[in-house]
Structure formats: C-alpha cells, structure tokens
Amino acid sequence: MLAQLTISNFAIVRELEIDFHSGMTVITGETGAGKSIAIDALGLCLGGRAEADMVRTGAARADLCARFSLKDTPAALRWLEENQLEDGHECLLRRVISSDGRSRGFINGTAVPLSQLRELGQLLIQIHGQHAHQLLTKPEHQKFLLDGYANETSLLQEMTARYQLWHQSCRDLAHHQQLSQERAARAELLQYQLKELNEFNPQPGEFEQIDEEYKRLANSGQLLTTSQNALALMADGEDANLQSQLYTAKQLVSELIGMDSKLSGVLDMLEEATIQIAEASDELRHYCDRLDLDPNRLFELEQRISKQISLARKHHVSPEALPQYYQSLLEEQQQLDDQADSQETLALAVTKHHQQALEIARALHQQRQQYAEELAQLITDSMHALSMPHGQFTIDVKFDEHHLGADGADRIEFRVTTNPGQPMQPIAKVASGGELSRIALAIQVITARKMETPALIFDEVDVGISGPTAAVVGKLLRQLGESTQVMCVTHLPQVAGCGHQHYFVSKETDGAMTETHMQSLNKKARLQELARLLGGSEVTRNTLANAKELLAA
C-alpha cells in the first residue's frame, strides 16, 4: 500500500507531503491546478522517464519519494530480499532529477538502475491512465488484459522459456549455415593438403632417427676404414700393436718388481690397461661386423629425408615439426566433419524446440479460451450497468502457429455490439469514444480484482462518462477500494462522492511564481468541493443539497 508521497521542486510544486490510506482516495481540483502532478511524481518513483523541464524553475533538482507499506505484499518483499534491498516491512522508492535532465533512482537508500525501480514498481502499484481506452483497440494490449485477468503466470513463463529456447536454436542453425561456405572452402583446402601428407605419413621423431641413420650410412666406408685402422693399432697389427707392447711392458715391470716391490702398483695398472684395450678391441670388431654398407637403404633414406624437407618447406614448418603439423590438419578435418554432422543435430533441435513451444502455446490457448468466456460475460454485465443495456462483449481467441511468439500463438480480438440487431465487430470499429471509455474502465476494474497488485491508480479514466453512469463507476471503484487501495483523479462529483478520503488540488500565484497545493478535505470542505463540481464556480443551496446526497449514497 502507498503510505506517503513526498514531492520537492517538481513542476509547479515546491514542497508537498501527502499521506495515503487504505480504501478509495479521490483527488479533485480546478482545471489546470495540477490534479495529476502527484500521479506523475509517483510514476517517476516507479522508473518513468524524466525530463529536465520537470524540475521547478529556479531549483537545482527535484526530489520525489514514495513510501510503501509491505504488510500485504509478499511478492514485493521476496523481490527486495532476492535483490538484497529489504528494510523491514516498508519500502522507499526515491527519484532525484537534476536540472540538466539527469536522474538517479534509489530503493531504501541504495542507488539502483531505473529498470529495478520499474520491476519493483509493477509489484507495488498499477497506474491506469486517461488514455487507457485508446490502448483497448490494440490486439497486444487486449492479450495483456486477458492474461492479466487470468492471472495464471506459470504457463506464460514456460511459454517464454520455450520460445526463447526455440529462437536460440534457430539462431544457432542460421549461424552454422552462414559459416558453411567458409567451412566447405577450408575442407577442400585441407583435403588437398592432406592428400600428399597422407601418402607420406610423417611420424613423430622419425626425421631425427632416419637423419642419424643416413649420416651413418653415408659415412660407412670411412667409418669402416678408420675403425679397422684403430683396431690394427690396438690389437690386430702384425708388426706392433698396443696389446703386444703392453705384454712386453708387463714382462719388464715384473723383472723390476723382483728388485723393488714398490713397482707392483705399476704392474696392476698395466694389467688393467690390457683388459681395457682388449674390451675396446672386441667392441670395435663387433661394430665393424655390424656396419651396414647397403646402398639401397642409403638411397631410401635420402629420398625420405628430401621429401620431408620439401613438404616442411611447402607448409612453412621445420622438418622436425612436420608430423605435429600433419596431426593438427587431421584434427581440423575431423572437427569440420563433426560440424557437418552438427548441422543435422541443430536442425533436429530446431524442430524439437518448435514442437515443444507449440505444445505449450496450445495449452495456453485452451487456458485463454476458458478465461475469455468468463471475462467477456463479466464485461457484458458491466456494460449493462454502465448504461449500455443492449451491449454484448465477446473475446475471440484464435490459434495461429505461424504467429508463435514469446506469449504464445494466439490472436486476441475484443468484439462488441452496443445496439440490438448489430453484428459483433472489432471494438475499434463499433464503440464510440464514450462507450470505449466505459468498456475500458469496466475491464480495468474487473482485471484489477484478479491481480495481486496492492494499489491501483485511475487517472481521469472516467472521461466521457456522466450522470447515472458516473454514479455506477463511483460505486464500482469504491467496491474495489474495500479490498484494494484505490486512488482516483476525477472531475466527476458522482465519482468523488464515493471516496473514503478526498484530496483537493489548488494553485496560487504571486505574479512571479505559481505553486500547487494539495490538502485533505474534512466533511464540510468536501461538501463544498462536491457542490463546486456539481454547479461550477458558484456553490448554491441546491448544489450543497445534492452534494450531501452524494456523500450519503
């Protein structure tokens, strides 16, 4: 419930503080006094668009604050808790507008984006403007009103989720198809590159291995000759070799040891050298025996190495890196093949998600049909009460799967006849301005009863209504005020007389500046204001008597 509205330096208001109560509050005033200023200020607290000229002339900024009691608003309390903005069972929505047009929003003293003001505002209050009857002719608004009356959000939420999933699947498939030409060109190039590489099939570490083998084979003649020369020096030479010389040396040292035992260590070293020379000689003999002098193998290696160097140069990599590069091309080719397969998967996902969205849309269609009949009958009854005794109202709900959107696949059309013998036609083609206003008001009152919003504002929605019809409208709003906080800006005494509270808006000027005031009326002042509304500027006994009748009704 809206508990208080504080306005500072807004439009022609310098300072204003208004306390609101439960029930129906009416706001009246002379033409041009600014009856809707409080509603405009509240709209800004709820995240409405701000302009620089909204700031009072001469002031640096306008400051607007709306205080709400959250006693019976669990949805708003949950929203505040989820956004970590809760502060007990009250909520302050504040808007500060600078003279340069910039503005800031606050919830319970914390700066927030305007989108959050709007989100929370929708849970706290609904504003029905004087042009609501114009919206009534628009199909999308008709759908909004029907869904608002149904007040069944689960299917709508699921419909939105399913539609978004389908829409994302369509975008994914379109993006995939858009890139398919690029992938096809790349796949063709890869196929050309891999044809030669597949035939060669480079293996990791192979180049280093065959390069070493090639060097060995290429130098095998020199390796054999040099190895044999070394072997001759160590053991196989006929004239002299290290083994025979060591043998002679050992004999001489043995004779010396007989004369001096200190030389026994020298003999040990010569024995060890003899063993080392023998082992080295054996190893060198085995090496010579194993040495491959196959010229065919040498040619094969030379061709393999030459081809790998050529391919590496062609692909701008080193010969050693060619196997890794080859593997990367194979992996990329596999990815492209997988992506080609994924197009079919994406297409299947589009079909699947579309069918799921249509399934929810059909369920939503059935729900709307059910509530459309119920709402149409209530509106028909209200039309009869609002001086349209022959009025009939229907709501057509047509399913069109080609019209699938986030809110389903229904085309909603409000149809009406106001005179006997006339066929049902779209509401925009049949109803006059006054009739449209009455029908719009009836719908707003009926749908408001079903919604959970704890406060409702009707800003001159009774335009085009007068006499007995106005009295019916006043009673409808008062009945609504028994269960919901209702605020109504009106110029009709029949409506104003139905309020539980009454505020009067006036303005005064000193010749240089104009200022708007708003005051709560006691019973006596209220009689005077109702009499003014009934008779114009002159209050007479008759108008006062009529005013008393309105208050007593």
Curated annotation (Swiss-Prot):
Q: Where in the cell is it found?
A: Cytoplasm
Q: Does the keyword DNA repair apply?
A: yes
Source species, domain of life = Bacteria
According to its UniProt record, where is this protein mainly located?
Answer: cytoplasm
Q: Which family does it belong to?
A: Belongs to the RecN family.
Q: Which organism is it from?
A: Escherichia coli (strain K12)
List this protein's GO terms for biological process.
DNA damage response; double-strand break repair; double-strand break repair via homologous recombination; recombinational interstrand cross-link repair; recombinational repair; response to ionizing radiation; response to radiation; response to UV
Kindly give the PANTHER family that the UniProt entry links to this protein: DNA REPAIR PROTEIN RECN
Q: Which UniProt keywords apply?
A: ATP-binding, Cytoplasm, DNA damage, DNA repair, Nucleotide-binding
Sites binding ATP sit at 29-36
Gene from which the chain derives: recN
**What is the stated purpose of this protein?**
May be involved in recombinational repair of damaged DNA.
Tell what triggers its expression.
Induced by hydroxyurea.
Q: Show the GO cellular component annotation of the record.
A: bacterial nucleoid; cytosol
Q: Which SUPFAM superfamilies match?
A: P-loop containing nucleoside triphosphate hydrolases
Among InterPro entries, the record links this protein to:
DNA_recomb/repair_RecN (IPR004604), P-loop_NTPase (IPR027417), RecF/RecN/SMC_N (IPR003395)
Q: Which Pfam families match?
A: SMC_N
Q: Which GO terms describe its molecular function?
A: ATP binding
Q: What is this protein called?
A: DNA repair protein RecN
